[in-house]
């Protein structure tokens, strides 16, 4: 296959991953993750690689895989840092998952922690250099879903009506 057809195939599988993620079908999302991880995304599509890595962290958070998360966080940070650029968006999210999230006990404390992260990311989102990192993955919608205790699909529907 040509480079273009490979890119299209990867984008299709990323779209499926993101769709399963939005619908909270994490088992199917993990299957798409595994499929995408077979490719050297870092060489093919750097933006896709970064988004897949961050979504992987969040899926495992959603699945309550607390024992696996510290290892995944280190691995994702290392992978993104090796890619010659680490967006502030990525650094802040990884730092939050590494340091702040494990300290949160649930309920109001969780909502406050996610709100604090949302405020940090909202400031970053306005930076011209950082905007590209927000295109592939709507982290703001996911954070709002956590703060408002709503399904991600509902939050996205409210933001982008049909």
Please report, for each region that a protein language model flagged, where it lies by residue.
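Alpha-helical positions within canonical tetratricopeptide repeat
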Residues: 27-31, 68
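Short coil/turn linking the two alpha-helices of tandem helical-hairpin repeats
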Residues: 43, 62-64
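Short, charge-rich amphipathic alpha-helical segments embedded
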Residues: 44-45, 85
